[in-house]
Curated annotation (Swiss-Prot):
Biased amino acid composition, Pro residues: 48-58, 235-253
Name this protein carries in UniProt: Defective in tip formation protein A
Superkingdom per UniProt: Eukaryota
Lineage: Eukaryota, Amoebozoa, Evosea, Eumycetozoa, Dictyostelia
Disulphide-bridged cysteine pairs: none
InterPro entries the UniProt entry points to: UPF0746_actin_org (IPR051904)
């Protein structure tokens, strides 16, 4: 039994899964069988078969262990791997007729199958063992099945492990083979990979070192795998098995079978094999790890396969691949991972080429996908997430903030900490909290009478100053605050409940003597608030909200505040119409008797662009007209300030007879049926091609203005007839006066709309629609008829003027549609100006933009007297071709446009398009020079000449220069004795000189060389007296943009680089705009020996403040200011010894001026580039300070607190000695304290202590140094943190009440002086807080230091800390500056029942 128990233990063997068969007589047990890639070994379940002639009693057979045959082909190979699936089933037990023929072979743990079995025992003992066998029959069967199953499972596990190791070894060998192939390719073709390729260099250097180790590793792996597999299997080949086949042994007894199964030697061998297997497996794992580390070390820059492949493909040249052999191409394809077969060289090359092209296409698609993704992120950057009110942050930042919030919210420790700070205010320790609680209990009991302080729920709690102020439901009563905070849901809820709401702060103070400015401001705030409400709440479901709003709060909305500026139902209705809130407008008309006004209401409705709103207002007005016949018809004049009314709206106006344009009515509604006044749905439909198109009507205003004159004349005639005035002369005089007044009004109003032209604000689509409208209504011919009637109707000529129809390039709708087909969809949405500019820069044929030119000509031809700027732009763009009226020539055009005033915009446009007409007509040189001086200060890139002229179009450029050149010579010769600059010889020279400088600014050396040859007098230099500052400040260095142009000008025009000053020539260094040009200029001066007599070395750098103000645009941008300081630092360093710095010159003092931009852009923001510029400014400034004895003023240098803070940090860290008395930093003690506070260093000010006033007898301790400006800023900006530091650190009088009493008893005079000083400063602080609306200052003092506001305490019985005069002053300032929330706080919370009216009466 012990042997049986021992045999049940699991066995671990290294052989392959055996094959189990029962052998019949004369059957070869070693006959091999074919094994496929998937070998399945099936073990049949045991079956008990009865013999053919069973005797009686039944015979019991003794079953020996089954024969186990090993499978063949168990050795591992490096090329292919086999997967063996073994299905383990219980062995089949057969009871043969003769037991002696059953051979049982049990050699599971023997090294080979040739071992001989044990001899057959004696027959004498057979009878004795029969009983034992019968007793152990069941246990033996179970025992045999369990043993076989366990053995098969173990063998299967071992086989799977071997296969896994084989696959790993094969992968490693393949990797080594790929590296060897690539190394051979590099060695054979060195020119294949460029030497600059980093990957090839690494392979080239490290491959020789790895070659020996990789070959040795490959041999070791192959030998180890083969040895281990052979040791595990140890199976002879099939031929040896057949030769060593022993004769069938007899059946052994049961104890002998157990001895064969588990001998001690086999157990020891098995343990040794297990240990060897574990060791080899560990060695193999370590080797693979080592190889992996080597690969990571070698490919540390190519961790990603795509990057690894990209670096390989960078070094491959497809043209060189064609010269390689087929074997080399296959190696390259194998290295790249391209599948290779038995292909020819051409096929292999095509496969590699297609692989490389496909890889490039994939990378391109990936880049396009990333770019689209980035664009989507940018477009979604300002969208809201979860109804957030953060508009400035992109979506990613909002999501990160939300994630951070929920992480903190789930953290119990952080959540309790934050809630604890919110509950106690976050500022004070436990003792101060207790004092605050005691004070709060006192205030609640004392102020329980007021409605705002009756309970804790009525207070304006300000728990945390870090996050925000928190208000309770009943405290939110101001509608303006609710609307500004976008809490429209809260507004709806409060209106539905009928809660208390304050719509206008002015209603709380109803005084009779209110200023007009206050009324206007109140009306503006009211309109702004209701505009937000109408724009946000406009759905049909909100009808109940507006009904409750207008019903329950009518006294606050519709009642008039005063007699001058009423806020009534008309104003509210007009706001609803303007905001296109159809729900509120319908409700006001139907239930609240709101009646729209003809001109104003309809104008607002058309301006909104909503057809439904226009229809509602028009039908309402039309009903009123039917009831009131005195209403005048609607005039086209209301379109003067409206943009883009639709054709559908115009149809409705024509239908209801509100559009009084006689010719259009005759053309359009001649065949229309009569329209019922009450019919709202009967809409006239005309011109189906223009039904849904939109046009810009504001730019067509000038085409209809002549009708106003006719209407005015007709109205005057009608009025005169009604008044029975039959004097024709009077009528004629009235008509003439009306015409003259209209013309004068047109010229005055023209200055407001002069820049609104087709070339500035029109898109191509709007231009096409406007031309369609002109052709449809035949407006051009109608205008000409009215124009000639107005000018020639009352003339004395007997001959009648014949009025003929004018012919234009476009006369029919088909021509416009043909032009429209030639324009792409993308160009239709572009501005006309941009399309024309692109066409001009391309220098294409005229046919390319002839269609746009014809459309512009048709538009400009309509009423050219009021479209002179359009005519001017058309002329400078398209040349001398006149599209305006025939009686308006070129000279009249310029005289009519601007005869007395120089227009810088027209001058700029003429330079950009290369049109010389405006330059020639206006001969005032001073105005041109003044424009260029201002231009340099306002524009960063001021290159204007030939901006929209193609660089290849030299003919147009030379033509422009020639006309101006000849005109300047003619003017100089004709008026040589003139006194002014314009028209004189000097004026002509200056005119040519200005043109010459602009050509230099264009930075075109080819054009400049041609101009010098053809126009030699253009470069003549003329010295001008300094009195004329505008002309004096234009110098050649300001126009040079490159080093090449500097070298050319220095060698050819040297006289232009020196200035007359103090009867000596001085170089103009500050005209250059960057230090590189200045350094090059100094190099040219040093290298040139001919100028030694003129250029004086060690010359003084002198200039006036005005020179810098006009010459260098130091205030235009931060970049230019940085360049300016770099130039000053370069001059201070003086590498060539050319400059001597005068220490107190205004030149250096101008460096400390504020570098704020003209657009108000701050110096620093989160942009990294601007931070780097700021660092460069600091480094340049430090260089200037080190090389000179200049004193500087920090307050003048930087106005922003963030800039000043960084600058003071730099001073404290690097130049702290400048802050001492008499130091280079010029600043007073008060200003220094103020600057320290603005730099965030209030602690330094507070540590200085008190200063003493020695004006009176004895020294009096009054206040810390220079805190007056600091306290003003605390009240101005609402800085409660600094206020608390000031109260706790600087004013010991207010720490405790007992301390104050003791101080008063010790030295009454000194204490009273300090007390009065505190009063003054606190009243000033509260005054600033009341002016700027900082209610948090009042809340902080009231809830934490209430004794400052308490007048009834014993402490201030003799004199309150803040007197009544101070409180009255605060109330008046709150009233004057419209800070009514602070006024409510003072009256209701603090408890001062004083009104501004009472204060004024007293």
């Amino acid at each position: 039994m012990k042997d049986i128990e021992a045999s049940k233990k699991p066995h671990t063997t290294t052989v392959a899964p055996p094959q189990i068969n029962f052998i019949k007589n004369n059957e070869n047990i070693f006959q091999p069988k074919p094994i496929s890639n998937v070998t399945t070994t099936t073990v049949q379940p045991p079956q008990i078969v009865s013999p053919p002639s069973p005797p009686s009693p039944p015979q019991t057979t003794t079953i020996a262990p089954p024969t186990i045959l090993p499978t063949t082909k168990t050795t591992t190979t490096t090329t292919t791997t086999t997967t063996t699936t073994t299905t383990v089933q219980p062995p089949q037990i057969v009871s043969p007729p003769i037991i002696n023929n059953l051979i049982i072979q049990n050699n599971l743990n023997t090294p080979s199958l040739s071992s001989t079995p044990s001899p057959l025992p004696n027959n004498n003992n057979s009878n004795e063992n029969d009983n034992d066998i019968n007793n152990l029959k069941i246990s033996k069967e179970e025992y045999q099945t369990q043993i076989e199953i366990q053995q098969q499972i173990q063998r299967q596990q071992i086989l799977e492990r071997q296969q896994l190791l084989q696959r790993r070894n094969q992968e490693q060998l393949d990797l080594l083979e790929r590296h060897n192939d690539y190394q051979e390719l590099i060695n054979t073709h060195q020119n294949f990979v460029p030497p600059n390729n980093r990957f090839s260099q690494q392979i080239h250097v490290s491959q020789l070192k790895k070659q020996s180790s990789q070959s040795q590793l490959q041999q070791q792996l192959s030998s180890q795998s083969l040895q281990q597999i052979q040791q595990k299997s140890k199976q002879p080949p099939p031929q040896q098995q057949q030769q060593q086949q022993p004769p069938p042994p007899p059946i052994p007894l049961l104890p002998q079978i157990h001895q064969q199964l588990k001998p001690k030697q086999q157990q020891e061998q098995q343990q040794q094999q297990e240990q060897q297997q574990q060791q080899t497996e560990n060695e193999r794992i370590n080797e693979l790890r080592r190889l992996k580390r080597k690969k990571e070390y070698h490919n540390d820059e190519y961790k990603d396969d795509e990057i690894y492949l990209d670096n390989i493909l960078k070094g491959i040249d497809i043209r060189k691949l064609e010269k390689l052999t087929a074997v080399e191409l296959r190696k390259i394809g194998k290295t790249l991972g391209v599948p290779m077969g038995n292909n020819t060289k051409g096929e292999t090359f095509q496969r590699i080429k297609s692989f490389i092209e496909n890889h490039k296409k994939k990378k391109q698609k990936y880049r396009e996908y990333q770019s689209e993704k980035n664009q989507q992120q940018k477009s979604n950057s300002k969208k809201l997430v979860n109804n957030s009110t953060i508009y400035d942050l992109p979506i990613k930042d909002i999501e990160h903030l939300e994630q951070l919030f929920w992480r903190i919210f789930r953290n119990i420790v952080l959540f309790r900490k934050i809630i604890g700070n919110l509950s106690r205010g976050g500022f004070f320790d436990q003792q101060q909290q207790q004092q605050q609680q005691q004070q709060s209990t006192m205030t609640t009991t004392s102020s329980s009478s007021s409605p705002m302080t009756s309970s804790d729920d009525k207070f304006f709690y300000c728990y945390n100053y870090i996050f925000s102020k928190t208000f309770k439901y009943d405290q939110i009563i101001h509608v303006s605050w609710i609307v500004d905070s976008n809490y429209f849901g809260l507004l709806k809820y409060k209106v539905s409940r009928g809660d208390l709401l304050v719509f206008c702060n002015h209603n709380t103070i109803n005084d009779g003597d209110v200023n007009d400015d206050e009324d206007q401001n109140t009306k503006y705030e009211f309109c702004k608030m209701f505009k937000k409400i109408f724009n946000s709440i406009r759905s049909i479901q909100d009808k109940s909200f507006y009904r409750d709003l207008f019903t329950n709060y009518s006294e606050f909305i519709f009642d008039r505040i005063n007699k001058r500026y009423p806020i009534d139902i008309y104003l509210v209705g007009s706001l609803a119409i303007e905001c296109n809130c159809l729900v509120a407008t319908k409700l006001l008309i139907s239930e609240f008797q709101f009646r729209p006004v003809m001109n104003h209401s309809l104008q607002l409705a058309i301006k909104s662009g909503s057809y439904k709103m226009v229809k509602l207002i028009v039908t309402t007005i039309h009903r009123q007209m039917s009831l009131n016949p005195n209403n005048k018809p609607f005039d086209i004049e209301m379109f003067s300030k409206i943009n883009n009314p639709s054709i559908k709206i115009i149809n409705l106006l024509i239908q209801l007879r509100l559009f009084t344009y006689s010719n259009i009515i005759n053309l359009v509604i001649a065949d229309a049926k009569l329209i019922n006044d009450n019919n709202e749905n009967d809409i006239l439909q005309f011109n189906k091609n223009l039904k849904n198109q939109i046009f810009n009507y504001s730019n067509l205003l000038n085409s209809f203005t002549f009708n106003n004159n006719i209407n005015n004349n007709n109205n005057n005639n009608i009025n005169n007839n009604n008044n029975n005035n039959n004097n024709n002369n009077n009528n004629n005089n009235n008509n003439n006066n009306n015409n003259n007044s209209n013309l004068s009004n047109n010229t005055i109003e023209y200055s407001k709309i002069k820049t609104k032209t087709v070339f500035n604000q029109f898109t191509i689509k709007q231009l096409i629609n406007s031309c369609k409208l002109i052709v449809t209504f035949d407006l051009k011919n109608q205008y000409q008829q009215q124009y000639y009637k107005r000018h020639y109707e009352d003339s004395d000529n007997e001959e009648e003027e014949e009025i003929t129809q004018a012919s234009f390039t476009i006369n029919t709708m088909a021509e416009i549609e043909f032009i429209e087909t030639q324009i792409t969809k993308e160009e239709k949405h572009c501005f006309v100006k941009k399309v024309i500019q692109k066409q001009l820069l391309k220098d294409g044929e005229k046919e390319d933009y002839d269609g746009i030119k014809r459309l512009a000509e048709l538009y400009v031809s309509l009423n050219p007297h009021l479209k002179v700027y359009c005519n001017f732009m058309y002329k400078i763009i398209y040349g001398n071709e006149n599209c305006y009226d025939q009686d308006l020539d070129d000279e009249d055009l310029f005289d009519y446009r601007v005869t007395r005033v120089f227009d810088s915009n027209c001058f700029k446009q003429s330079l950009k398009y290369g049109s010389p007409g405006y330059w020639i007509e206006y001969k005032e040189v001073e105005m041109k020079y003044a424009f260029l001086s201002n231009k340099y200060r306002n524009e960063i890139t001021p290159n204007l000449l030939f901006k929209y002229v193609s660089p290849n179009n030299l003919n147009k450029q030379l033509k422009f220069i020639k006309k101006i050149y000849n005109s300047s010579i003619e003017n100089g010769n004709s008026n040589g004795n003139g006194n002014g600059n314009g028209g004189t010889v000097i004026g002509g020279i200056l005119d040519r000189l200005l043109l010459f400088y602009l050509i230099i600014e264009n930075n075109n050396l080819e054009l400049l060389s041609i101009v010098i040859k053809e126009f030699p007098l253009i470069s003549n230099f003329c010295y001008i007296a300094k009195s004329n500052s505008e002309i004096y400040n234009l110098k050649i260095p300001r126009f040079i943009r490159s080093i090449e142009m500097l070298e050319f000008c220095f060698s050819n025009f040297r006289d232009h680089f020196y200035l007359p000053q103090s009867n000596s020539l001085t170089a103009d260094f500050y005209g250059f705009q960057n230090v590189e040009l200045l350094r090059k200029y100094d190099q040219l001066m040093v290298l040139d020996d001919m100028d030694k007599g003129i250029i004086v070395s060690n010359k003084k750098v002198r200039a006036s403040f005005d020179d810098f103000h006009f010459i260098f645009e130091w205030g235009s941008s931060l970049k230019n200011y940085n360049n300016y300081l770099k130039m000053l630092a370069y001059i201070v360093e003086d590498p060539y010894g050319l400059y001597t710095i005068v220490t107190n010159e205004i030149l250096l003092l101008s460096a400390i001026l504020s570098p704020t931009t003209s657009s108000g852009e701050p110096l620093l923001n989160l942009n990294i580039e601007r931070q780097l510029i700021f660092q460069e400014i600091i480094s340049s400034f430090s260089t200037i300070l080190e090389g000179t004895e200049l004193k500087y003023y920090p307050e003048q240098m930087f106005q922003e607190s963030t800039h000043l803070k960084r600058f003071f940090d730099w001073i404290f860290e690097n130049r702290s000695e400048d802050l001492l008395i008499g130091g280079r930093c010029v600043i007073t003690q008060s200003v220094q304290s103020h600057m320290l506070y603005r730099a965030g260093r209030l602690d330094i000010v507070l540590r200085k202590g008190y200063y003493y006033d020695d004006t009176n007898e004895g020294s009096k301790k009054i206040m810390p140094v220079g805190l007056a400006l600091v306290l003003d800023d605390i009240g101005k900006y609402g800085d409660v943190v600094a206020l608390e530091k000031y109260i706790r650190s600087c004013i010991p009088l207010m720490k405790q009440q007992s301390e104050l009493l003791t101080l008063l008893d010790k030295d009454e005079r000194e204490s009273r002086a300090c007390f009065s000083q505190c009063q003054r400063h606190f009243s000033s602080l509260l005054s600033k807080a009341s002016i700027y609306g900082r209610i948090n200052i009042f809340q902080h003092i009231f809830y934490n230091h209430q004794f400052i506001f308490d007048k009834k305490s014993l402490l201030f019985a003799r004199k309150g800390f803040l007197s009544k005069i101070s409180f009255k002053k605060l109330i008046l300032e709150c009233h004057y500056h419209k800070q009514h929330h602070i006024l409510d706080f003072i009256q209701n919370v603090i408890g001062l029942d004083i009104t501004p009216k009472q204060i004024k009466s007293n």
